[in-house]
Amino acid sequence: MKILLVRLSSMGDLIHTLPAIEDLARQCPDVELHWLCEAGFADIARLHPFVKKIHVMKWRQWRKHLFQAETWQEIGRLKQALRQEAFDFVLDSQGLIKSACFAKMAKFPIYGLDKNSAREGLAALAYAKTYTVPKGKNAVWRNRELFAQVFGYAMPETQVFGLTVPEAGRLKNLEQPYYAALHATSRDSKLWPVENWRALLQKLNE
């Protein structure tokens, strides 16, 4: 079985999808999984060894140059590449109108969340098959539950991210214990005030 996963962005959304992929790798090891995501987050998708191939889109760049021929040429090449893969189906785990539009590029049946479960209910109109996943749960649980329903297995009790971190990206010889502060975000509305960071770090250092 050959599947295209559509989870375009942002960084946190891709990370929250990794435990579902680990479940799939353990429960259905014969699945060939491809992943379509925003180019800027492709390295996150590459961290999981079960993902055989990454297909990248550049919507954050394309939307600024929609009237340029080069933009549509790149979109056309992406369409062609996806359609040549002959997927059994496309799984849109993001549940947005944008992700549904990119999922349709592949021209294969799309599976996804139903209108009451998706973040944008209209996205479900593009799906050949839909699944109900409660909104009240956290993102990791919802992704794992969606995958479990789509591929027909019971969600494992243990949550595992299954990452393979390249040697060059590993931090070594750090004194224990240590803290990692992740401050970056692609949206200003998610930024935390500097004084809050200072207060947190001072508290941790006590």
Q: What is the role of each PLM region?
A:
Residues M1-E206:
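Catalytic machinery of carbohydrate-active enzymes
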